[in-house]
Regions:
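A short, charged helix-loop
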Residues: 168-189
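Glycine-rich anion/phosphate-binding loops
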Residues: 20-22, 53-69, 91-103
Length: 316
């Protein structure tokens, strides 16, 4: 069994950053800010609610950072510093599990050039809480309330794969990363660099964590607007269609855990979006447009009503 000090040592940074003056091991981190603005977000991952027991320590470590990176990306900022809280059951408190978890955290931090600067650990049911700080670096901050009438609505990637991936794991009781949908759940992609470019024209933006329909409704409510959505334009993978057949659009609307970007743009920017799509090798689909109606209208949709199908942690 590792002591708290042993665990903390596993997370000490391997590459120093000049703006971090006081690091892990002190009572708090000291960071020199070059700009006045700071983006802050927090996500909590709990075993059985946010991830199944089949995930490895490495994958849990990676995913705990990635879902926070997606929140910072949704505002167009650059991720910089992480604070992590870890509750750990005694049976997992061993050097093998902890080293694997720490390796996952460090791997994503290195890939996205951000830094774990502090945190806490205690015994309890497995959960990971991450606070991520980001720097706008002088770019526009994209919030959820800027959609305007006639603005186009876009989404990145394929929607619904992560839901299918989670069900694959729960059904088979194993993690098969050869499966496209399973990979989408285990290792989502934070669209950080693309989001930075989107700040040039995007008027509102949100990441898709709790289902596409739910996030569309949030943008509508925050902007006091509505949307018309063409269900035929929702980007759905062949793998999702194969698994759910005629229910694939419904699953895309309600599934959650995709961590793709949903955003609005003024009309007439299709060629600009096409260039970004090619540059970042990311599918970007126009799925609808904004209205003044304060309601969501779905075209070409044949599935169940969606209002009561959106994800809510506290809904039974």
């Amino acid at each position: 069994m590792l002591s708290e000090t042993n665990i903390i040592e596993l997370f000490k940074a391997k590459t120093p950053l000049k703006d971090v003056q006081v690091d892990i091991g002190d009572d708090a981190a000291l960071i020199n800010l070059q700009n006045n603005a700071l983006i802050a977000c927090k996500d909590l991952m709990v075993l059985g609610t946010h991830f199944p027991e089949e995930l490895s320590a490495y994958d849990i470590g990676r995913r705990s950072v990635l879902v926070n990176l997606s929140d910072v990306a949704a505002m167009g900022a650059t991720p910089k510093y992480l604070l992590m809280g870890l509750t750990l059951p005694q049976e997992l408190n061993n050097k093998f599990w902890m080293k694997d978890f720490a390796r996952g955290v460090h791997q994503i931090c290195k890939a996205y050039k951000c830094r774990l600067v502090g945190g806490d650990v205690c015994r309890g049911p497995l959960s990971v809480s991450v606070t991520l700080l980001g720097d706008p670096e002088g770019r526009n901050i994209i919030t959820r309330d800027g959609a305007r009438e006639d603005h186009d609505l876009y989404v990145t990637g394929n929607i619904g794969d992560a839901r299918a991936g989670l069900e694959n794991i729960l059904e088979s009781k194993r993690v098969d990363l050869r499966n496209q949908c399973t990979r989408s759940f285990v290792s989502p992609i934070a669209r950080v660099e693309l989001a930075k470019r989107l700040t040039k024209h995007a008027t509102s933006m949100i990441d898709i964590s709790d289902g596409l329909y739910n996030e569309i409704k949030i943008l509508a409510d925050c902007s006091s607007k509505g949307f018309v959505i063409d269900s035929n334009k929702i980007p759905i993978s062949t793998a999702l269609k194969k698994k759910y057949k005629h229910r694939s659009v419904e699953i895309a609307f309600t599934g959650g855990e995709d961590y793709e970007l949903l955003f609005t743009l003024p009309k007439g920017l299709e060629s600009w979006i096409t260039k970004l799509s090619k540059k970042f090798s990311v599918k970007i689909s126009k799925i609808g447009y904004c209205t003044s109606s304060k309601s969501i209208k779905l075209l070409n949709y044949q599935g169940e009503k969606l209002e009561q199908r959106t994800y809510d942690h506290f809904r039974k």
